[in-house]
């Protein structure tokens, strides 16, 4: 449940409290004491709740402390986690938590609004704590650079939450199907979308649930509306293009093993009249190490949920459709005349069992589109994720923490910085009305770059 669902826009705000989802006690797996990692959570909003729920299901993970500036959420987290056997302490201020719990914490999970990621992650790293930080690294590149520098300086694991990088189905599709066995041949184009209609701004009509205004202002928010809807304000987030697009644009880097050379994007605030773009359509051009030009189209819409979210990779020999929800995309299809029997015999793909959907409706309606022509036979991927989507990425992080080896991470700060550059550039392209061209060095933080604490602690961000 996210903040929007939790806080219905009714006068009886308190009445929604009992509807909060409850984990069964048997799901709160802790594991043997000699293999435990004690962790802290910073931020218990929608994403923080998801990550916390996944953490408690991983053997050997004990949550010892949690921080959120909203007292309602802190107390709710405390009640839930203590019921699952996690004797946690709760805090309003992350610095107080890290100072008091220093000897009790092995690692920290950060799930705060984007503008605070750098401040929280850098502070934790320099306190000697490995960090799992939700994407996007930041809504400002200067802050994302500080995260890279802090990880370099400390040598500690800093995992960025592009969880598809640890999803076994995505790993099989990209590494095994597309890259190692070249089932699709040369992949010339890619398409991805995340269409999700959004509700009006979340509000709270029961004033007793609000964060006191002095507390909000202490932590950089003018009012409760900004706090609840931070993704739509330039100071705090990058809008839907950054919030949603970062997951999928990262896949283009992974598939082609290179960074883009240009992005051209159009969009605007055409429906909701908010600070950040409510729709964006972007074309990325990639130049591979072999000198080949490939293109990818990405769109994010907030006025319609048509087709939901999925990715499609198109090659000379066939195409493959993916989605975190397998009903929306879990199949590859050959071009006419291509025989993929050898790939099914090798176990790379399963036998044909269903047509490939051009697009699939929202998750509660997975009926296929009607067609005039016969659908191509889809060969399903033989790998299915049977865990929550974020859990493998968290497990990968905890493995790196236990082994004290940041090289084990599937998405460290250096890698995530590359996609941050590309995603933030799309907003810039919209704002400036022009194509943004990249140089290879744009995607790397220079080896001789110097740490600037001010850039991680409160620099006023721009819409780029």
Label the predicted regions.
Residues 43, 47, 153-159, 164-274, ...:
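Predominantly a Rossmann-like dinucleotide-binding segment in NAD(P)-dependent oxidoreductases
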Residues 284-289, 315:
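Active-site beta-strand termini and strand-to-loop segments that position acidic
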Residues 88-106, 110:
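A structured beta-alpha segment of the ubiquitous adenosine-cofactor-binding alpha/beta core
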Residues 13-84, 167, 252:
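N-terminal Rossmann-like dinucleotide-binding module
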Residues 113-114, 118-166:
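Beta-strand-loop-alpha-helix segment that lines the small-molecule cofactor/substrate pocket
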Residues 1-14:
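N-terminal secretory signal peptides and thylakoid transit peptides that target proteins
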Residues 10-13, 50, 224, 244-254, ...:
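C-terminal helical cap and adjacent loop that interface with cofactors, partners, or active-site loops
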């Amino acid at each position: 449940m996210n903040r929007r669902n939790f806080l219905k826009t009714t006068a009886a705000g308190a009445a929604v409290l009992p509807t909060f989802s409850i984990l069964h006690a048997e799901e709160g797996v802790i594991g043997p004491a000699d293999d435990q990692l004690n962790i802290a959570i910073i931020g218990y909003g929608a994403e923080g709740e998801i990550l916390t729920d996944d953490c408690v299901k991983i053997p050997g993970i004990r949550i010892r402390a949690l921080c959120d500036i909203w007292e309602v959420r802190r107390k709710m987290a405390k009640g839930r986690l203590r019921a699952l056997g996690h004797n946690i302490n709760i805090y309003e201020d992350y610095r107080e938590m890290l100072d008091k719990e220093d000897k009790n914490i092995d690692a920290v999970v950060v799930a705060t609004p984007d503008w605070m990621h750098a401040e929280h992650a850098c502070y934790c790293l320099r306190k000697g704590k490995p960090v799992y930080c939700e994407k996007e690294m930041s809504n400002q590149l200067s802050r994302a650079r500080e995260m890279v520098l802090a990880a370099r300086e400390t040598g500690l694991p800093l995992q960025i939450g592009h969880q598809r990088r640890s999803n076994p189905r995505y790993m099989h599709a990209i590494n095994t199907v597309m890259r190692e066995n070249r089932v699709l041949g040369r992949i010339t184009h890619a398409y991805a979308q995340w269409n999700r209609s959004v509700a009006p701004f979340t509000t709270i009509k029961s004033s007793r649930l609000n964060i006191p205004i002095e507390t909000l202002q202490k932590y950089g928010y003018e009012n409760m509306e900004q706090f609840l809807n931070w993704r739509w304000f330039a100071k705090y987030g990058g809008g839907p293009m950054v919030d949603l697009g970062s997951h999928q644009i990262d896949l283009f880097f992974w598939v082609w093993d290179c960074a883009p050379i240009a992005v051209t994007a159009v969009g605007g605030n055409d429906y909701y009249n908010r600070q950040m773009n409510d729709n964006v359509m972007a074309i990325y051009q990639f130049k591979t190490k072999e000198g080949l030009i490939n293109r990818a189209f990405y769109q994010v819409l907030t006025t319609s949920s048509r087709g939901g979210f999925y990715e499609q990779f198109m090659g000379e020999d066939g195409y493959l459709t993916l989605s975190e929800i397998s009903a929306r995309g879990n199949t590859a299809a050959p071009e006419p005349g291509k025989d993929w029997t050898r790939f099914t015999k090798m176990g790379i793909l399963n036998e044909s069992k269903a047509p490939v959907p051009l697009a699939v409706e929202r998750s509660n309606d997975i009926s296929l589109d009607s067609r005039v022509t016969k659908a191509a036979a889809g060969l399903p991927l033989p790998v299915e994720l049977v865990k929550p989507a974020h859990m493998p990425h968290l497990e990968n992080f905890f493995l790196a923490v236990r082994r004290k080896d940041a090289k084990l991470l599937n998405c460290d700060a250096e890698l995530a910085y590359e996609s941050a550059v590309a995603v933030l550039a799309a907003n810039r392209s919209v704002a400036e009305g022009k194509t943004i061209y990249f140089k290879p060095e744009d995607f790397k933080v220079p080896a001789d770059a110097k740490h600037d604490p001010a850039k991680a602690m409160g620099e006023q961000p721009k819409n780029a």
